[in-house]
A protein has these predicted regions:
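Conserved acetyl-CoA-binding loop-helix of GNAT-fold acetyltransferases
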Residues: 96-109, 274, 280-295
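A short, internal acetyl-CoA/4′-phosphopantetheine-binding micro-motif in the GNAT/acyltransferase core
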Residues: 87-95, 125, 271-280
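Conserved GNAT acetyl-CoA-binding A-motif
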Residues: 111-131, 295-308
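C-terminal "cap" of GNAT-fold acetyltransferases
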Residues: 148, 152-189
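A conserved beta-strand-loop-helix scaffold within acyl/acetyltransferase catalytic domains
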Residues: 30-57, 63, 71-79, 206-266, ...
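Conserved small/polar residues in nucleotide/adenosyl-binding loops
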Residues: 312-314
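Conserved catalytic-core motifs of GNAT/GCN5-like acyltransferases
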Residues: 78, 122-124, 139-143, 148-161
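Short amphipathic alpha-helix that is part of the acyltransferase structural core
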Residues: 1-54, 62, 176-224
Length: 314
């Protein structure tokens, strides 16, 4: 068996369809009913975007005329430029033939050629298999090839709508704690008058949130990068819901963001963070409740919120 690995043209519908088909099949096999799969259109938009933030590359894996897998490589261009993000998708019927191993070697060579010194990837497994995912294909594949688990997350699902009386009780409970802060919410782009303050806080998320043993560095605040991510959301047909808490001096004290996929009808919890100096004022729950209120009002069709919580907190 000889595996041919070729980079796809993101504007070639047939190649994108084949790439996405392998990705979706692998995700559904590994996660079952809990699989959260980006739509074909969402993936296509991301691959086609001309990004100043990340160099995205996607590959097809072929055995003769048969497509047996797909892979992708993400190379950050502004922050953490020592890192390469790797992803490999081999549908179950093609596993245990060395296809993933060849794909991994190819991605690692590409990463080294691009002067990257750290490779990162992710794997999913059923919760009942424990914090190490023993026996699950993804974690076992990674361990066999010298990768170690740096950070574990648990996917959770909140059915919608949330009982309004529960939100009322929470708001009443936290009212005095947040009385000195201004809470602002919006749908779509971050308003121009707060985007710089949002960006300053958002840049600390990767290092303020649990990072385990991940080799990552603090990001530099960059409004252009935020605006690029918003442009991608528009291309994907996704809708962003944002809430910010402003301190008495006008700085960003906390924020939260939900993104709704118009493809699957679900909402996804993106960043939520409270600035260290403002912790203890119930701001985390305040911005989340405000976002849920807005989500109920503006997107009543949303079926659930998916979120990811570090194992460190469980």
């Amino acid at each position: 068996m000889t595996i041919e690995i070729s980079r796809i043209d993101p504007f070639d519908d047939d190649e994108v369809d084949a790439w996405w088909g392998c990705y979706a099949a692998a995700e559904r096999a590994d996660r079952g009913a809990d699989a959260v799969v980006w739509s074909r259109a969402e993936c296509r938009s991301e691959l086609q975007q001309q990004s100043a933030v990340v160099d995205r590359r996607a590959y097809l894996l072929r055995d003769g005329a048969d497509i047996v897998g797909s892979a992708s490589l993400g190379l950050p261009l502004k922050d953490n430029t020592h890192v390469a993000h790797l992803a490999i998708s081999v549908p179950p019927r093609h596993r245990r033939r060395g296809i993933g191993t060849e794909a991994l070697a190819h991605l690692e060579r590409e990463a080294v050629t691009s002067d990257r010194t750290t490779a990162q990837g992710s794997a999913s497994w059923p919760y009942e298999l424990g914090s190490e995912g023993a026996g699950s294909p993804g974690p076992e594949f990674a361990r066999r090839h010298g990768y170690t688990l740096a950070l574990g997350d648990v996917q959770s699902r909140l059915p919608l709508p949330v009982d309004p009386s529960l939100l009322d009780r929470i708001e009443n409970d936290i009212a005095s704690a947040i009385s000195q802060y201004e809470i602002r919410s919006w749908v779509g782009r971050i308003p121009d008058d707060v985007v710089e303050r949002w960006t300053i806080l958002d840049a600390t998320l990767e290092t303020e949130a649990p990072t385990g043993e991940l080799d990552i560095e603090p990001q530099k605040p960059d409004v252009d990068s935020i605006r690029e991510s918003e442009e991608l959301l528009d291309l994907q047909g996704r809708v962003s819901f944002g809430t910010i808490a402003l301190s008495p001096d006008g700085d960003a004290a906390a924020y939260s963001q939900l993104v709704v996929s118009t493809d699957d009808g679900n909402a996804y919890q993106w960043g939520t963070l409270v600035r260290a100096a403002d912790r203890g004022h119930r701001l985390g729950i305040a911005v989340k409740v405000a976002n849920l209120r807005m989500l109920h009002r503006e997107a009543p069709q949303a079926r659930a919120v998916y979120t990811y919580l570090s194992l460190i907190h469980i």
